[in-house]
């Protein structure tokens, strides 16, 4: 909204001039007129309906009984605290003070929350798709499940808890300066594009764990071990993938939250940084303390964390490259 609203006025018109217009003429007039004055209740509702038919989402602010029809017709009915009781009952939003800046701030905050919700849905969907694809491939190649069902549920629960902070994340100005439609049309494209990248690094982790780390600690390849040693092998493997999945899902938020370069061109909110770092530390500690044993997790050697750090850095780098290509082709990310 402009601080000097008069400079945004294109033209104005009176209600008495609308009677002779056809529907097509009125549709054109509504698109090119900023102020209508001296309108009847039916004309107010008619203009709102025309704007809706033109593809707009329309809010209407009223305070008297003659605004009731327009309030019902609008997508968002707005009233003030001192308005008639019937109008307040019909309105979706009631202003507690006479200040239109409240509406502007509310709209902008709503758009920011909407963008952050879109971030969560897209990033979570792509991560889950990548994990599912990795599980399917691993189920064919491995003699055991790469992660138990309770571990998968715990991983998703912990990730969702961390993502509760996302509504307070910073949003790039170009993402909320204009209205955005709630649509899942590009969700599948985003998921299919970024999900398999996660799968590549999941499979890389599988290979590292199955062919080197687990045999080294357990004392041999899986098929050559006795039952007890095989259980140790499986626990190490599942813990390794649990950590890799958790680290990669959380840290990739920073890369996919904006089409800009993270921390340089687009800085996440401090609470988001704090919560994600604390979350990673706590969930990593969970694999060390006794409580982790109840869900089949165990302590991993330091050599694994060196590998984990390398994998996560490579994953973020590849996603950043893919993101640049994606934005260049589709002109958007979120």
Where are these regions (language model features)?
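Cytosolic ligand/metal-binding cores
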Residues: 71
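Membrane-embedded transport module
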Residues: 7, 12-60, 74, 79-261
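Short, exposed "boundary/linker" segments that immediately precede the start
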Residues: 1-4
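Conserved Rossmann-like nucleotide-cofactor binding loop
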Residues: 66
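Glycine-centered helix-boundary capping/hinge motifs
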Residues: 6-7, 296
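C-terminal transmembrane module of polytopic membrane proteins
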Residues: 214-216, 239-334
């Amino acid at each position: 909204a402009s601080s000097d609203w008069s400079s945004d006025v294109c033209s104005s018109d009176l209600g008495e001039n609308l009677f002779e217009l056809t529907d097509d003429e009125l549709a054109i007039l509504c698109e090119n007129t900023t102020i209508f004055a001296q309108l009847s209740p039916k004309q107010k509702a008619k203009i709102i309906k025309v704007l809706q038919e033109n593809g707009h989402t329309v809010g209407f602010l009223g305070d008297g009984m003659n605004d009731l029809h327009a309030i019902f017709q609008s997508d968002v009915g707005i009233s003030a605290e001192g308005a008639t009781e019937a109008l307040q009952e019909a309105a979706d939003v009631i202003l507690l003070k006479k200040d239109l800046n409240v509406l502007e701030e509310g709209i902008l905050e709503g758009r920011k929350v909407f963008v952050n919700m879109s971030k969560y849905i897209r990033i979570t969907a792509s991560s889950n798709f990548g994990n599912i694809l990795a599980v399917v491939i691993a189920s064919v190649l491995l003699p055991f499940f790469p992660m138990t069902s309770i571990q998968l549920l715990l991983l998703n629960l912990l990730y969702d808890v961390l993502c509760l902070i996302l509504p307070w994340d910073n949003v790039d100005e170009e993402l909320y300066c204009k209205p955005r439609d709630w649509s899942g049309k590009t969700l599948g494209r985003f998921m299919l594009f970024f999900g398999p990248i996660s799968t590549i690094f999941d499979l890389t982790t599988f290979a590292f764990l199955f062919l080197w780390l687990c045999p080294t600690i357990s004392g041999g390849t899986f098929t050559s071990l006795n039952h007890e040693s095989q259980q140790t092998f499986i626990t190490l493997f599942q813990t390794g993938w649990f950590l890799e999945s958790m680290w990669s899902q959380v840290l990739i938020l920073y890369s996919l939250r904006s089409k800009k370069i993270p921390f340089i061109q687009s800085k996440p909110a401090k609470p988001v940084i704090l919560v994600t770092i604390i979350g990673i530390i706590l969930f990593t500690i969970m694999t060390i303390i006794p409580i982790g044993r109840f869900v089949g997790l165990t302590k991993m050697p330091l050599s694994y964390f060196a590998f984990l750090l390398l994998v996560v850095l490579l994953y973020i780098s590849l996603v950043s490259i893919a993101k640049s290509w994606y934005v260049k082709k589709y002109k958007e990310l979120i």
